[in-house]
Curated annotation (Swiss-Prot):
Pfam families: Terpene_syn_C_2
One GO MF term attached to the UniProt entry: terpene synthase activity
Family as reported in the entry's similarity comment: Belongs to the terpene synthase family.
Protein name (Swiss-Prot/TrEMBL): Terpene synthase 9
GO biological process: terpene biosynthetic process
InterPro entries documented for this protein: Isoprenoid_synthase_dom_sf, Terpene_cyclase-like_2
UniProt keyword Lyase, yes or no: yes
Catalytic reaction equation(s): (2E,6E)-farnesyl diphosphate = (1S,2S,4R)-beta-elemene + diphosphate; (2E,6E)-farnesyl diphosphate = germacrene D + diphosphate
Keywords: Lyase, Metal-binding
Function text: Terpene synthase that converts its substrate farnesyl diphosphate (FPP) into the sesquiterpenes beta-elemene, germacrene D and a yet unidentified sesquiterpene.
Motif annotated as NDxxSxxxD/E motif, chain positions: 222-230
Claim: Lyase is one of the keywords in the record: yes
Record gene name: TPS9
Top-level taxon in the UniProt lineage: Eukaryota
Amino acid sequence: MSLSFKNIVFPEEWQVPPNDYIFIDDCYEEALQFNLFERGDEKSYTWMYHTISCCAYFWCKCSRSEMKLIGHLMLWTFLLDDILDSDKVNDAEAIEMIKRTEFIFIEGKLPENPTDLEKYTCYLRNEGLKIAGDREDMFNMFLTNSIQWILSIIPLNKSMEHKLPPHLQLHGYLRKLNVGVELCQGFTYLIFANNKVNPAIFNSPRYKKMLECTSMVVSHVNDMASYCKEVKNGGGFINSLLILQKRADPLSIEHSYQVIAEQTNAFIRDFIYQEKMLLESISDEQQNEVKVFLDHMKYLMKGNYLWSGTTARYASKSSPFVEMQKSLNVHLDNEIDASSL
């Protein structure tokens, strides 16, 4: 079977060369200081490399120092999410972990008996405060977006505990929060905290709609890329393709992809329309100020599309998508029985 991402159509101008990957080793060295990995553990390094390498596509024009902070923040999200997605913690432990992490973001200090990951969380939160400087509004948006993402993890995980898949609209609502687009935008608020954007723009319905469109495009492409990984790890009910395959009137993988691809292209078209209308409604000066944030949404959408076809995080010879059959690594096994497609 050879489905392809190529049915997803992006404007050509959205494609920008990825940033240098050198920031990954910068992050790795500092992560070792927080005891997050053991030096020489090739499997952990491979896992980290193929997760935070997405940053090179999402923030393709940032400096090395900016990329190091972004890389750390992205690493933190994957570390936290992978723990909560696994069987390493039970429900009570997961809820307590969420509460303690939220406390760190709000208070800027550590809870009692902090773990190494919590120390890392607090360090990054307070580094963000330094970078934001006197732009308390930008820092607060970073905090709020981060907390909302943290609080979305358990509800999304719980949505796949039922015998039947959730309705696609319910799944989409949860994924808009959990896929991390607004979280990534929060990182961008820190990096470009000195931009003189009128805060009313960030709160406008059009800007919010563009974030929603971006979230759904990233979510759908991620569902295509991670298809085999989700099947293998039992996370099928958080994958839109598998939801369509498992519902009462099941669709084939080919038909499921057609439905999701059409939805994705519709979100891209809506984003383009909303951007046009937003820019026409503000001054030339404000257009220049908000451009970096709108461009970042485009880099998230097209960058995720490009990165997904290169990372071994989701690669699988048994994937129905030809792009995912190429980039393989012995440390990341996503192979599944073809009969499950």
